[in-house]
Amino acid sequence: ATEKEEKERQGASGALRALLCLTPVVLASVMHGLLRDGIITWAPSYLQESFRFPAATSIALTMIVPPVNLAGVYAFNWLRNRLRWHETGTAAMAFAVCGAGIVLWATLGRGSVAITLMMLILSTTCMAGASTMLLSLLPLRFYRMGLLATVIGLLNASAYVGSALSSVGFGALSEQWGWTSVLVAWCAVSAAGAALCAMARGVRRAFP
């Protein structure tokens, strides 16, 4: 009985350490939710106010985004397999490319519908790739510890927190300081997401 209790304590301790290692990934999942749903939710309003499109046209233009985003799932999964990267490293790259796209959007796309749509597609495609890495593939590494469902639930809940914050936060930001401030905020969130994924060394060491 004593040996069994010791094994149970060791298992609980290992599970706790594993979950603590996930702290940067949990925060990165919040950033992912902020960006993914923030961009998708507010893109029609951005197009309507920036280019004077009717609401129906703005919504129709953003409807092309989800099908194209599937390319991000395959592209970043291919990159991970090709370069033998960890999921957190691949997600960091997705955040970085997303941030670069938003910088181009902010600097070159304010007067161009074509550039705006291209950068909109690029940024959301990157977030589709990050979603696959953080919310689908990374939790599989915790299967042997019996934490698969826990990690999936934790990371998805974190993404939903970001999604909820984006619904209110970016709308208030655009009303107060305009769309430039929203684009700057998206750049900052992208940088934070990339940094948090890069900081997730504990996960990479424990689950290479």
What are these language model-derived features?
Residues 18-77, 131, 135, 166:
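Extracytoplasmic gate region of multi-pass secondary transporters
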Residues 31, 64, 68, 122, ...:
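Small/hydrophobic positions within alpha-helical transmembrane segments
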Residues 54-62, 116, 148, 152:
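Juxtamembrane helix-start elements in MFS-like secondary transporters
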Residues 72-86, 174-175:
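Helix-to-loop junctions at the C-terminal end of transmembrane segments
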Residues 1-25:
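Juxtamembrane intracellular "pre-TM" segments in multi-pass secondary transporters
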Residues 86-137:
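C-terminal transmembrane helical hairpin of 12-TM major facilitator-type secondary transporters
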Residues 105-107, 179, 184-208:
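Multi-pass alpha-helical transporter architecture, strongest
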Residues 142-177:
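A late C-terminal transmembrane helix in Major Facilitator Superfamily
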